[in-house]
Amino acid sequence: MGPLSARLLMQRGRPKSDRLGKIRSLDLSGLELLSEHLDPKLLCRLTQLQELDLSNNHLETLPDNLGLSHLRVLRCANNQLGDVTALCQFPKLEELSLEGNPFLTVNDNLKVSFLLPTLRKVNGKDASSTYSQVENLNRELTSRVTAHWEKFMATLGPEEEAEKAQADFVKSAVRDVRYGPESLSEFTQWRVRMISEELVAASRTQVQKANSPEKPPEAGAAHKPRARLAALKRPDDVPLSLSPSKRACASPSAQVEGSPVAGSDGSQPAVKLEPLHFLQCHSKNNSPQDLETQLWACAFEPAWEEGATSQTVATCGGEAVCVIDCQTGIVLHKYKAPGEEFFSVAWTALMVVTQAGHKKRWSVLAAAGLRGLVRLLHVRAGFCCGVIRAHKKAIATLCFSPAHETHLFTASYDKRIILWDIGVPNQDYEFQASQLLTLDTTSIPLRLCPVASCPDARLLAGCEGGCCCWDVRLDQPQKRRVCEVEFVFSEGSEASGRRVDGLAFVNEDIVASKGSGLGTICLWSWRQTWGGRGSQSTVAVVVLARLQWSSTELAYFSLSACPDKGIVLCGDEEGNVWLYDVSNILKQPPLLPAALQAPTQILKWPQPWALGQVVTKTMVNTVVANASFTYLTALTDSNIVAIWGRM
């Protein structure tokens, strides 16, 4: 399709007319239009146009100054749009469709909400559902930028040139003012720049009024946003909600047990944590009465920059997967699959090349559960871009390989672990996965853990029948393999065959495992154990320490580790979080295991309010912290996500 012509517009316009100025509705969908085909000089003649359909084309941007000031309905679905700021030229827009533009993210949705205060519907849904989210973000950013302005102005000397100082302020605000999740950083920095420039402009108008410093006017008042979050592409068979109902529970003050001072073993002082948010975001049918949905797994999104840390966590349970910002407690995304029960989630980061040759970083979330399907979610764009029919039975757990960002392990109740290569999305932004290996197990695999020192060579799994290891090197000819070594945790006739339902590497050598003995978590050396195996198929682990845990006989409480901080975490049957600082063991492993070590501290269940009563007790199925240990997320058996923050 070449450039548009007046004749084509009259052919596809309604009502039929030989004058462009009388057309009120125009359908330009499916014409393979490029951005340069939209001629502002031609389109501005559509002075009465109220409805425009540009769906199913190849548009990367919308030209400025199209002159369609009366436009009320705009459809831009299934294009290649990467920016939405040009939409501000349509101040009367009421309905907007943007689904199927894979490079638009939640940041663009928020920009749309801010720029178009008259919007009523986005992608066919009520656009006012997330009003409070954008409003709260804007209010907090305005407050922080204003405080930064006052601090900045107080440091200026009288001799400093005002123009240069004000330009420096805008740069420093964009660099230093932070709020909200990393996934919203594009929107927040965009707003910070706008607010900063408004403050600078306001200060210039006041220079002649007074010499004494005054508090800057409320920034952004002329652009009070309508906070509406647009939901992007949704598969027809699996609805996606980007504006889930979120129920926060008020909580009395939490009780924390454990000494907050340095121990005699030389460990660091215990960190202080406080409960921040309690969310019911996995409720069946979005019912606030649901205190029964079991939540099973959570994982923090990988940081976008090396050395940084993430505050965005994915949680799963029931028929929903949620992505939550730990700082604000906002549910950023919610993916629902009716009839599914999600058991596991895992993140990876992929570099995708667009049709225009640009590179984009995608955070991809894999989620799986009862139906044996793996769903690959492009979280920031908000849609499912692939489904792997991985197993005929339920998937208990999954994880990505640290060595290969596209390699995904899935472990199922069919007693198989399969290694997949999910690849990178094609031009239609769909994954085409291929199967690389099948690993047979003698019992149901519960936890997967690539060996930290050689993740592309060995895989550990905690199973109903014990702890096993497989050779996963891809340069070997066999594509179906059995367990190479089984690890046992004690001597005697009952040494093997015991469930291992918790497994994590604390560093490249030391493994934390749970389930082999009641009331204990075992720390053992991979290097020493593997080095002493010889040709044996059953090997006793070299135990370095045993950590005291709950004496419950209940199973399936998953443990996790925070390697950067030398911390091991595990929930229990009463809603508590057991925290162990094992940094001293990592620095100097003991020659012989010492006596059972007590936890560094126990975070007692804070007993939040729900349905007008206190939730006095629950089971914490899993607990995970981000790399810097600033946030901790605990998932319960009673549909409550508990988020703790470091004080």
UniProtKB/Swiss-Prot annotation:
Recorded GO CC terms: centrosome; chromosome, telomeric region; cytoplasm; intracellular membrane-bounded organelle; kinetochore; nuclear origin of replication recognition complex; nucleolus; nucleoplasm
Molecular function per GO: chromatin binding; histone H3K27me3 reader activity; methyl-CpG binding
PTM annotation (Phosphoserine): residues: S212, S243, S251, S259, S264
Gene Ontology biological process terms, A to Z: chromatin organization; DNA replication initiation; establishment of protein localization to chromatin
Region (Disordered), start-end ranges: 204-267
LRR repeat coordinates: 22-43, 48-69, 70-91, 92-113
WD repeats: 282-335, 341-379, 383-422, 426-472, 484-526, 542-582, 598-646
Pfam family, one: WD_LRWD1
Keyword Cytoplasm: yes
Keyword annotations: Centromere, Chromatin regulator, Chromosome, Cytoplasm, Cytoskeleton, DNA replication, Kinetochore, Leucine-rich repeat, Nucleus, Phosphoprotein, Repeat, Telomere, Ubl conjugation, WD repeat
PTM notes: Ubiquitinated; undergoes 'Lys-48'-linked polyubiquitination leading to proteasomal degradation. Ubiquitination occurs within the WD repeats at the end of the G1 phase. Ubiquitination may be catalyzed by the CUL4-DDB1 E3 ubiquitin-protein ligase complex and other E3 ligases.
Primary location recorded for the protein, binned into one broad class: nucleus
Coiled coil: none
Domain of life: Eukaryota
Cited SUPFAM superfamilies: L domain-like, WD40 repeat-like
Tissue-wise expression: Testis-specific. Drastically down-regulated in testis from patients with Sertoli cell-only syndrome (SCOS).
InterPro entries noted in UniProt: Leu-rich_rpt, Leu-rich_rpt_typical-subtyp, LRR_dom_sf, LRR_LRWD1_dom, LRWD1, WD40/YVTN_repeat-like_dom_sf, WD40_repeat_CS, WD40_repeat_dom_sf
Subcellular location: Nucleus; Chromosome, Centromere; Chromosome, Telomere; Cytoplasm, Cytoskeleton, Microtubule organizing center, Centrosome
Family listed: Belongs to the LRWD1 family.
Domain notes: The entire WD repeat region is required for the interaction with ORC, CDT1 and GMNN, as well as for association with chromatin and for binding to histone H3 and H4 trimethylation marks H3K9me3 and H4K20me3.
Complex and partners: Integral component of the ORC complex. Directly interacts with CDT1, GMNN and ORC2. Interacts with ORC2 only when non-ubiquitinated; this interaction prevents LRWD1 ubiquitination and degradation. Some of these interactions are regulated in a cell-cycle dependent manner. Interaction with ORC1 occurs predominantly during G1. Association with phosphorylated ORC1 during mitosis is not efficient. Interaction with CDT1 occurs during G1 phase, as well as during mitosis with phosphorylated CDT1. Interaction with GMNN occurs from G1/S to mitosis.
Protein role: Required for G1/S transition. Recruits and stabilizes the origin recognition complex (ORC) onto chromatin during G1 to establish pre-replication complex (preRC) and to heterochromatic sites in post-replicated cells. Binds a combination of DNA and histone methylation repressive marks on heterochromatin. Binds histone H3 and H4 trimethylation marks H3K9me3, H3K27me3 and H4K20me3 in a cooperative manner with DNA methylation. Required for silencing of major satellite repeats. May be important ORC2, ORC3 and ORC4 stability.
Entry protein name: Leucine-rich repeat and WD repeat-containing protein 1
Species, as recorded: Homo sapiens (Human)
